[in-house]
């Protein structure tokens, strides 16, 4: 079993093109959709309208996976956050003291979902699957920073090809594909300031929804006698932290493109599983 963990953004789509061109030896790509109500709508549109047709035209399997509950129903990150009576905070919210919270979203909705798929298709400790992750050369410090499960062997083919993130637009354009948006949940607390500013300016309805989610989380926290949490690093409600007309000062590299999200918090979380 040999699969590429596809995240929907720059590196993943560059890898898809390289595979179609015979430069990357992967013919099965797995996209973990963490929820139609959770993924950025622009990412879902790109995957369905561009990536999947391109993959099919070049004999590549691009499977869309979702997390299922024991009763067979689909579970989403947004659904877990907003479920009646839920105390779960699977996303890395900022605590009231500024510290990042722990999270389980990547492990539960991506790593375990891909793990289940490869095991269903024959992966085991005796015959582990090769799972490729789209980390580019400029992100080499992110490679090998999570525990490898017995049923898998992690691979970083973009490193072998010495592909940098800045190379991805040219690779994608060479296939006649438009540039994909940066991939992440629309409410992800790892968004940098620029992403929130762009959302408020370009997609105000989505920004308002993020503010509403923050309100819901804090209403529940208040009922439980707990401190507030925030979706940004500014220690105040999103609608106050991001003002209308605010300028983007620095390039925003916030994304969840490698198919998995990797941060120090995730490394610690993985070793607690």
What do these predicted regions represent?
Residues 1-273:
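Nucleotide-activated chemistry modules centered on ATP-dependent adenylation/adenylyltransferase
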């Amino acid at each position: 079993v040999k699969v590429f963990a596809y995240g929907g953004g720059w590196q993943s789509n560059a890898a898809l093109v390289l595979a179609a061109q015979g430069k990357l030896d992967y013919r099965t790509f797995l996209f973990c959709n963490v929820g139609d109500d959770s993924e950025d709508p622009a990412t879902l549109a790109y995957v369905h309208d561009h990536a999947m047709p391109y993959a099919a035209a070049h004999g590549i399997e691009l499977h869309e996976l979702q997390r299922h509950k024991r009763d067979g129903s689909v579970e989403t990150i947004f659904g877990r956050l907003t479920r009646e009576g839920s105390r779960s905070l699977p996303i890395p919210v900022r605590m009231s003291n500024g510290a990042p919270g722990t999270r389980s979203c990547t492990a539960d909705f991506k790593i375990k979902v891909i793990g289940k798929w490869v095991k269903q298709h024959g992966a085991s400790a005796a015959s582990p699957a090769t799972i490729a992750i789209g980390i580019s050369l400029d992100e080499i410090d992110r490679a090998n920073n999570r525990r490898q499960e017995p049923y898998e062997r992690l691979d970083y083919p973009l490193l072998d090809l010495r592909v940098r993130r800045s190379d991805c637009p040219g690779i994608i354009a060479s296939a006649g594909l438009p540039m994909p948006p940066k991939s992440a949940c629309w409410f992800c607390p790892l968004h940098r300031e620029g992403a929130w500013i762009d959302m408020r300016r370009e997609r105000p309805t989505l920004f308002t929804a993020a503010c509403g989610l923050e309100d819901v989380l804090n209403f529940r926290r208040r009922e439980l006698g707990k401190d507030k949490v925030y979706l940004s690093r500014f220690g105040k409600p999103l609608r106050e932290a991001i003002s209308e007309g605010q300028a983007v000062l620095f390039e925003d590299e916030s994304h969840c493109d490698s198919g998995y999200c990797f941060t120090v918090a995730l490394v610690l979380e993985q070793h607690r599983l």
